[in-house]
């Protein structure tokens, strides 16, 4: 029972993602997110944090994978709620307009 629900969820996510790609909405959402994150200073905050980590550990001792692993949780936490809410609203509107999924 649990497996079939997970499978249905995965199928639904795949169908939604496919529709987002086909309509070009996925790219528009990514552009909106990129602009909003720059606008609120998120990109600069993360860049500064990356520099701190590299300075702490030394350039020779940090791989890109290390940096990503260290930065990702902070990056997610720093996304303002207003940006999350706006993106979620855009996705909900899109889904309402394409309810045939």
From Swiss-Prot:
GO process terms (BP): chromatin organization; negative regulation of insulin secretion involved in cellular response to glucose stimulus; poly(A)+ mRNA export from nucleus; positive regulation of DNA-templated transcription; protein transport; regulation of DNA repair; regulation of RNA splicing; regulation of transcription by RNA polymerase II
GO cellular component: DUBm complex; mitochondrion; nuclear pore nuclear basket; nucleoplasm; SAGA complex; transcription export complex 2; transcription factor TFTC complex
UniProt keyword terms in alphabetical order: Acetylation, Activator, Chromatin regulator, Isopeptide bond, mRNA transport, Nucleus, Protein transport, Transcription, Transcription regulation, Translocation, Transport, Ubl conjugation
Glycyl lysine isopeptide (Lys-Gly) (interchain with G-Cter in SUMO2), cross-linked positions: 74
Highest rank taxon of the organism: Eukaryota
KW Acetylation (keyword) present: yes
Compartments, as annotated in UniProt: Nucleus, Nucleoplasm
One GO molecular-function entry: chromatin binding
Keyword check for Hydrolase: no
PANTHER family the UniProt entry points to: ENHANCER OF YELLOW 2 TRANSCRIPTION FACTOR
Family: Belongs to the ENY2 family.
Protein purpose: Involved in mRNA export coupled transcription activation by association with both the TREX-2 and the SAGA complexes. The transcription regulatory histone acetylation (HAT) complex SAGA is a multiprotein complex that activates transcription by remodeling chromatin and mediating histone acetylation and deubiquitination. Within the SAGA complex, participates in a subcomplex that specifically deubiquitinates both histones H2A and H2B. The SAGA complex is recruited to specific gene promoters by activators such as MYC, where it is required for transcription.
Subunit structure: Component of the nuclear pore complex (NPC)-associated TREX-2 complex (transcription and export complex 2), composed of at least ENY2, the isoform GANP of the MCM3AP gene, PCID2, SEM1, and either centrin CETN2 or CETN3. TREX-2 contains 2 ENY2 chains. The TREX-2 complex also associates with ALYREF/ALY and with the nucleoporin NUP153. Component of some SAGA transcription coactivator-HAT complexes, at least composed of ATXN7, ATXN7L3, ENY2, GCN5L2, SUPT3H/SPT3, TAF10, TRRAP and USP22.
Name of the protein in its database record: Transcription and mRNA export factor ENY2
């Amino acid at each position: 029972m649990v497996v079939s629900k997970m499978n249905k969820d995965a199928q639904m996510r795949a169908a939604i993602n496919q529709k987002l790609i086909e309509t070009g909405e996925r790219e528009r959402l990514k552009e909106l997110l990129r602009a909003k994150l720059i606008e609120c200073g998120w990109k600069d905050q993360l860049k500064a944090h990356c520099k701190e980590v590299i300075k702490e550990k030394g350039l020779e001792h940090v791989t890109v994978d290390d940096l990503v692993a260290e930065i990702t949780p902070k990056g997610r936490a720093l996304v303002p709620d207003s940006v999350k809410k706006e993106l979620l609203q855009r996705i909900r509107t899109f889904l309402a307009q394409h309810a045939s999924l």
